[in-house]
Amino acid sequence: MTLASAPAATESCNSFIPPSFDVNKVEIISDRPDCATFIFTDEDHTLGNALHYVLMKNPKVDFSGYSIPHPSDNRMNLRIQTKSNITAQESLLQGLTDIKDISRHIFETFNNALDQ
């Protein structure tokens, strides 16, 4: 199952995913709504560590962990377990939104410092 075809997240994903994003880049392995493994193709520690950090700041997330199966393998596995009032897919989308907001803040702060 890909991120865009996941039943619980289809509507919210389509409003978040930019048109240029390859939805086949993320595969979801899940048997419960509150627990899932997301396999990202062509991603590494940069996204994995950032997502793990912001997910663990979310009080609705019980567990987050990522791994790179092998250095020559171009995949990153992210495991998320949430409390029952939010799905793992919703917490992933919130985490990606948080990273985007943090990046925007850093960019604006840096540019403002350059302008001074």
Curated annotation (Swiss-Prot):
One of its GO terms (molecular function) is protein dimerization activity. It comes from the Eukaryota. Pfam families: RNA_pol_L_2. The keyword Nucleus applies. It is found in: Nucleus. Its main location: nucleus. InterPro entries: RBP11-like, RBP11-like_dimer, RNA_pol_Rpb11_13-16kDa_CS, RNAP_AC19, Rpo11-like. One of its GO terms (biological process) is transcription by RNA polymerase III. Keywords: DNA-directed RNA polymerase, Nucleus, Transcription. GO terms for cellular component: RNA polymerase I complex; RNA polymerase III complex. Component of the RNA polymerase I (Pol I) and RNA polymerase III (Pol III) complexes consisting of 14 and 17 subunits, respectively. Belongs to the archaeal Rpo11/eukaryotic RPB11/RPC19 RNA polymerase subunit family. DNA-dependent RNA polymerase catalyzes the transcription of DNA into RNA using the four ribonucleoside triphosphates as substrates. Common core component of RNA polymerases I and III which synthesize ribosomal RNA precursors and small RNAs, such as 5S rRNA and tRNAs, respectively. This is DNA-directed RNA polymerases I and III subunit rpc19. It comes from Dictyostelium discoideum.
